[in-house]
Regions:
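Aromatic/acidic cage segments in peptide-binding pockets
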Residues: 86-96, 102-128, 280, 315-335, ...
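Generic preference for well-ordered alpha-helical elements
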Residues: 106-109, 122, 127, 193, ...
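Catalytic cores of histone-lysine modification enzymes
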Residues: 11-14, 18-50, 54, 222-257, ...
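Acidic, Ser/Thr-rich intrinsically disordered and amphipathic helical segments
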Residues: 104-112, 195, 199, 205-207, ...
Length: 479
């Protein structure tokens, strides 16, 4: 006998303006062929480029419903509280579309979004058991010193909160894309591009998806090697590799190649366009007692979700040697891939392989290891003569001191909640990846966003920086 199913509407509990989810009796499905008309009315007021709420509640504002399902065998059921803390392994969630169709998987929802030409993308839908779909945390408005540090350049507003004093962050130019005064060649004629019409859902036929997959195979990605030992086909492997429903849980150290400006696929709905479509999480810049400025999230973020990219001015090592060393990140994807050709590659974990990005942050003012070498070795006195960007051995650096995005405020933690992924969009040059940050676990509302600076303690004589992360596995020192 089939299992009984009990549906419980899931309501949110936080804030004075909770998300409205209507009762189960409304929106009953009537048999029809789904088309853009199914979402036209529900989405008429939805503006994808202006997000003012928890992004994972956006479907509710566009006519979607969300239900807690309990399945019980032996023809009986028992009602459970609709809270994520009590969900058992036999529970699930059900999304109901504006036209009344019910979906149990994100694959089904993704197909529906394509079929209806919806403004929503799959990244706004959640299928894990721990992410709470609640309105954003509200902090005391009297301590908000500035409404939006991005000055309208992001899809979201990021307020500045300081309950310790009236100080604001040091001034800088906010930008969402890396910029540079350098002149270097970017041969786009050799870039992979696609002409997909299915939002690039058929990965085995999308050249961009295949580029990511083939590069990973070429560099002996551990995940792919394991699948090959299980005799999985390329088609079976590629559908479970890299972005899954626009989330990245396992980093791809050989790089991810997103669809680009030459591709004919949809610029917003494409399943292989994520990092390029900007920040969509609700964040707040706040002042701490021990670490200066920090960044926290105002709602739960599911594991694998994209946060944003590290943005700055692109400079050479020689130029960096003359700069005030703050907010630096080294782009070293090319030498990283070269290093993986040694025979010890397979002994390294995926996480360790990704730790090729070193940063110099905020008040620390400490040059990273690569920059120390450039300080000692460079003989060039004129920054204008540093036009060696075409040198295959050159290394480039992002400087976010005077120009950057909100990511310039990320602090260090020995137990980080974000990981780094090198992504290639409008350049396939291995020296110019986009440094993207993804949630490496579920992040709770109010939690500070941190990454691991990965400094080597003792690499700088006579310099000691104690760690302030207070994590259970804290290493005690940054340097």
């Amino acid at each position: 006998m089939a299992d009984s199913i009990f549906l419980t509407p899931v309501f949110v509990s936080r804030s004075s303006s909770p998300v409205s989810i209507r009762s189960f009796s409304s929106n009953v499905h009537q048999s029809h062929q789904c088309s853009p008309h199914c979402v036209l009315t529900a989405e008429e007021n939805f503006i994808p480029d202006c997000i003012i709420q928890n992004p994972y509640t956006l479907p509710f504002s566009c006519g979607w419903k969300y239900f807690h399902i309990d399945r019980y065998a032996k023809d009986r059921f028992k009602k459970k509280p609709s809270t994520r803390k009590t969900i058992s392994s036999r529970s699930n969630y059900l999304y109901r579309s504006p036209c009344g169709r019910s979906f149990l998987t994100l694959d089904e929802i993704e197909q529906y979004l394509l079929q209806t030409n919806s403004k929503l993308t799959i990244k706004f839908f959640v299928d894990d058991r721990t992410t709470r779909l609640e309105s954003c945390i509200k902090y005391e408005s009297k301590y908000i010193l500035y409404d939006d540090i991005t000055q309208g350049k992001e899809y979201v507003r990021i307020p500045v909160y300081n309950e310790n004093n009236s100080n604001l962050p040091e001034s800088f130019i906010y930008g969402t894309e890396t910029r540079s005064k350098l002149i270097f060649s970017n041969d786009t004629t050799t870039m992979t591009c696609c002409s997909c019409t299915d939002n690039c859902r058929n990965r085995i036929k999308c050249p961009c998806w295949l580029k990511t997959f083939e590069q990973a195979k070429l560099n002996e990605n551990e995940q792919i090697l394991n699948w090959q030992r299980q005799n999985l086909s390329d088609e079976q492997m590629i559908i479970r590799f890299a972005y899954i429903h626009q989330r990245l849980k396992i980093p791809v150290w050989s790089g991810i190649y997103e669809c680009n400006s030459k591709c004919l696929c949809h610029t917003k709905q494409c399943t292989n366009r994520l990092v390029q479509n900007s920040l969509y999480q609700q964040l707040q810049l706040f002042h701490t007692n021990t670490k200066g400025w920090a960044l926290r999230v105002l709602h739960d973020i599911p594991y694998g979700s994209f946060i944003n990219a590290y943005v700055g001015e692109l400079i050479t090592e020689q130029m960096a040697a003359k700069r005030d060393f703050k907010y630096l990140a080294i782009l070293d994807h090319k030498s990283h891939l070269t290093a993986t050709n040694n025979k010890n590659r397979k002994e390294s974990s995926i996480k360790n392989k990704l730790d090729d990005v070193r940063i110099l942050h905020a008040k620390n003012r400490i040059p990273v290891k690569c920059c120390i070498r450039s300080l000692n070795d460079t003989q060039t006195d004129n920054e204008d003569d540093d036009n060696d960007e075409d040198d295959d051995d050159s290394c480039f650096i992002l400087d976010a001191k005077h120009y950057g995005s909100i990511s310039r405020f990320y602090n260090h933690s020995c137990k980080p909640n974000v990981h780094i992924q090198n992504v290639f969009i409008n350049s396939h040059n291995p020296r110019f990846p986009v440094i993207a940050l993804f949630a490496c676990r579920n992040i709770r509302a109010g939690e500070e966003i941190c990454w691991d600076y990965n400094y080597s303690v003792g690499c700088m004589p006579n310099v000691r920086i104690d760690c302030q992360c207070q994590a259970s596995n804290c290493r005690g020192r940054l340097l």
